[in-house]
Structure formats: structure tokens, C-alpha cells
Amino acid sequence: MALQMIAPFLSSFLPNPRHSLAAHGLTHQKCVSKHISCSTTTPTYSTTVPRRSGNYKPSIWDYDFVQSLGSGYKVEAHGTRVKKLKEVVKHLLKETDSSLAQIELIDKLRRLGLRWLFKNEIKQVLYTISSDNTSIEMRKDLHAVSTRFRLLRQHGYKVSTDVFNDFKDEKGCFKPSLSMDIKGMLSLYEASHLAFQGETVLDEARAFVSTHLMDIKENIDPILHKKVEHALDMPLHWRLEKLEARWYMDIYMREEGMNSSLLELAMLHFNIVQTTFQTNLKSLSRWWKDLGLGEQLSFTRDRLVECFFWAAAMTPEPQFGRCQEVVAKVAQLIIIIDDIYDVYGTVDELELFTNAIDRWDLEAMEQLPEYMKTCFLALYNSINEIGYDILKEEGRNVIPYLRNTWTELCKAFLVEAKWYSSGYTPTLEEYLQTSWISIGSLPMQTYVFALLGKNLAPESSDFAEKISDILRLGGMMIRLPDDLGTSTDELKRGDVPKSIQCYMHEAGVTEDVARDHIMGLFQETWKKLNEYLVESSLPHAFIDHAMNLGRVSYCTYKHGDGFSDGFGDPGSQEKKMFMSLFAEPLQVDEAKGISFYVDGGSA
């Protein structure tokens, strides 16, 4: 179904002669001539048809608040200092001769959010380390072996799990004496989350160290205690890069051997990127206000700020600001349409809307009720406008493929609406075949590939097949945590049974057992993506974006429905996350330390 349309879309990434706009029948005028602003008219939906309500909370992030964001940390003001500090760190990387010291420095750079500044240097060091036959002493250091294993796998190197054999006894079990090496066990725990499917040794390692770390975490020094608690709450491999950087800077400044230049660079870089995020979010907020769709369709969720949080998590690199804005727009439009299918529209109306999206012409729009016309036209203009920009700049007409992702999404929404209307409970397999699409990742990932496609040209003949699987896995990375966090609330609102309920119905098990099963599927999805990162010829960026969807989804839904409700709850972890990333700059003052806002257990 959805994957059948991916191959021709991906072929547009291949180098081709630059086409004229006229050759595609597209000019800017034709592409956006129906552009609308909805803010000056009254609501356009019928009040005569009985409608359900999602009882969604309003957004707390009003326009004036977003427009007031600003920290003053710009490259122009701090660029000279950043450049000097970068040279200091480059020298540090070059002069560090111990393999363990190099590994630990690279790990610090990643955790401090600096890997993008030293991409080439890190690549060179890891290449050397990957071919280094480490000393006997280092091979017997659990921390060194585990950290090396994790970093190399994170960067796409093949590393065998045989490196952990030295830490097993004659029965093939991890030696009980390892429980005395807390630092080593913590590193092994983090490494175990880079497992592939079938690597039981890493599953055994995770179970072994988890038990011991839980038992001893109260009887260790405060900094190590924070690290253990942080890891057990969520492994490093599953964490969002910027949130981890915010948390780790507070830890690093208290560590023995802290390098002040490294810490200062991390803080300055964080603040400069935060300023870039603020600029992009302000632009996005102006677009949303001008569009006026939230006021017109007041039964839907206004989650623009949350959408930008997701977009920035999916493509955290600061140079991808345009991509972040576009993905945030797409995500907010997905929410609007999702609320129409889930809560507001009748089945007959939804069939008309799905048909209009499939036909993709303004004549089809005329059959829709007024509230759907508003939504259709906003979507129509947005897709054409983005497609026009890509065609103008790169000579690739991606509009047919962008359209197709929305068609597949709406068809999946319609299937679920009919399930709900008829009271049907699908099998888990049947549910997942539809719900990985209905979660909305397909348009988001496709837009990312379209915007970054010129930098991600395929190199293998089986590219289309592999990327199709990445798209599906990306959808699963959102769907499974979403169901774990939101299914109770969504069933109360009136929604199709989620994966938990489908498995309970199919297998005749309790909710706790079903939740464990769905969490197991999430872990297996991670393992598949881990293997793609190492074994696949695909550009790592494709796989990273799918992994980032899992990271932001798990972060958002770990403690409930953090997307629909949590960002608006005073004191919620989700609100704290937003404020720490987008609103509150770090105080770059060694004498005072860092102003710390994110709780160590949730970042």
C-alpha cells in the first residue's frame, strides 16, 4: 500500500538535469494562487450534525509569548570565542594518545551536544580506534570495552559481541564480581541498547546490570548515583540529544578532570542553537497566526509549539532550520486532520474528504462540507508551496510524492474511523499494518527526505526497498510509545482500540501483560534500526531520523499523553523540557556554574 509509492519518489533524489518550472506545469502563481488566510471569517462547520468532542486543552503558548523569546546569543556576538574554543578542543582530540582517553573524550563531545562541530575529527579518531588491537589491559576493562563498542556501533562500525566474552565465567554467564565495578556496569548497560536482533548476550547483559544497578544505586557517591538513576530511567541511546546535553552539562561541571574550555564551548553552542530555534519558532508562529486554521477549526488541537519540539528533535542539526519549520507545519496539519477523522467528522464526510485528497483537485473540494473545505485548501496550498520551493531550488518535482503520503495517511485514518464506527477490534497485526501509517510519520519523514534529498543520494540498487522499511520502522517508533502513553485517554474520548487492547482481545491477557508485549515490540524495533545503522548501505541520516522519531516519542509519552495534555500542565516535565531547550539560556559563568532546569530523571 503505502510502500508501493516510495520507489518513484526516491528516484527523484538521483542526480538529474535541472528542469524548468514550466516543464512541470508549475509556477509560483499557479502553485499557490488559492492561498488562504482563515483568520477573518467565522467558523465554517455545521452545528446541525451531532459531533463528538475530544475535550482537548488549549495551547498555553500564545503568539505574544513565542514572539517574545530571545536570548541574545548569536554567532555574530560569540563567534570569535567559539572559534577559539573549537581550536582548543581540536588540539585536545589530536594530542590525546590513549585509546581510552580518546573514547571518553568523544563520548563527552556527544553527550555535550558538540558532535556536529567535530564530525570529521571524531570520524578520523573512530576509524583509527576501530582497527586498533587494544591492549590486554584495556580488553579487560569493562568500561573501556563497553564504551568503545557503543560508540563504534553508533557510528556504523561492525563490532562483534565477542568482545564481552572476557567478562563471562565458564558457564557463559557474566561474572558476579563485575557487580563491584559500577562504572563498568553502567557502561555495559548503555552498550546493551545497541543490540541487534538475536544478540542474546546483550539482552543478558542488560538484565544482569539492571538488577545490580538497582540494588546498589543508593550506596554510591552522588554524581555516580545521578548517572545510574538517569540511565535506568532511560538509556542514553534512546535520549534526545539536546535534552541530554542540557542534563549532562550540570553533571560534567562536577566531574573530576572537567575541562573548562570544553564546558564553555558546550554552553555557548547550546545558547547559539537555542537562538536559532527561537528564530525558527517565531517564523512558524507567524505562519500559524496568518493561516488562522486553529480559530476556524476550534475543535482541533493547537499544538504548534509541541510540533516544533518534535521537528527539532527529528532533525536537531542547526543547519536544518528550514527543514524543522516545514516538518513542524506538516505535523500541525496532521493533527488537524487527525482530529477531524478521530473526533469530529462523520464516516460519510470522511469518505468524501479522503476522495478529495486522493483526487487532489479543487473541484473535488466543492463536494466537502465547509469546515473540510477550509482544511483541504490549507493542506493543498502548503504542499504545493513547499513543492514549488524544492522544484525552484533543486529542479525536482516532489509534489506527486508528497501528495501520495497524505493520501495514504487519510486512507489509514478512514480505516480506523470505520473500525470505531462499527465497533470492530482488529488483530494486533492488522492494527499495526494500518496504524504505523495513521500515526503520521510517513508525511514527516517524506518531507525530510524531500528537503534533504540532494545530500542523501542513494548508492545501492536496493535503496528503495531498504528505505521503505526505514519508513515503516519510523512509524512503529512513534506508534508503540504513543499507544503505551495515550491509549487509556483516547479510549475515554472514543477511539479505535490501540495495540494494547488489540493484543488483550486477541491473546486473552491482562493489560499489564499486553503492555509488556508492546514494549517488547518497541525494543525489537530499536534492534532492527541498530542493525540498519551498521549493516545497511543507506546514508546514516535516513536511519538517524527514524531513530529520532523513537526518541522524541518515548520522551513525550513515557509518563502519559505528554503531547495532547502534558505541555500545557503547569510543572509538567514536558513544559520544563520546552523551556530548557527554547526559552532559558545557560549562564556562561564559571564562577556561578550552570542554571539547571531539567530534572535528571526525565531529560
UniProtKB/Swiss-Prot annotation:
It catalyses: (2E)-geranyl diphosphate + H2O = (2E)-geraniol + diphosphate. Keywords: Chloroplast, Hydrolase, Magnesium, Manganese, Metal-binding, Plastid, Transit peptide. (2E)-geranyl diphosphate binds at R301, D338, D342, R479, D482. Mg(2+) 3 binds at D482, T486, E490. The keyword Ribosomal protein does not apply. Its cofactor is Mg(2+); Mn(2+). A motif (DDXXD motif) lies at residues 338-342. Pfam families: Terpene_synth, Terpene_synth_C. Mg(2+) 1 binds at D338, D342. InterPro entries: Isoprenoid_synthase_dom_sf, Terpene_cyclase-like_1_C, Terpene_cyclase_plant_C1, Terpene_synth_N, Terpene_synth_N_sf, Terpene_synthase-like, Terpene_synthase_metal-bd, Terpenoid_cyclase/PrenylTrfase. Expressed in the oil cells of the leaves. Pathway: Secondary metabolite biosynthesis; terpenoid biosynthesis. Its EC number is 3.1.7.11. Residues 1-50 form a transit peptide. GO terms for cellular component: chloroplast. It is found in: Plastid, Chloroplast. It is an enzyme of class 3 (hydrolase). Monoterpene synthase that catalyzes the formation of geraniol from geranyl diphosphate. Exclusively observed in the geraniol chemotype of this organism. The Asp-Asp-Xaa-Xaa-Asp/Glu (DDXXD/E) motif is important for the catalytic activity, presumably through binding to Mg(2+). Belongs to the terpene synthase family. Tpsb subfamily. Homodimer. This is Geraniol synthase, chloroplastic. It comes from Cinnamomum tenuipile. The gene is GerS.
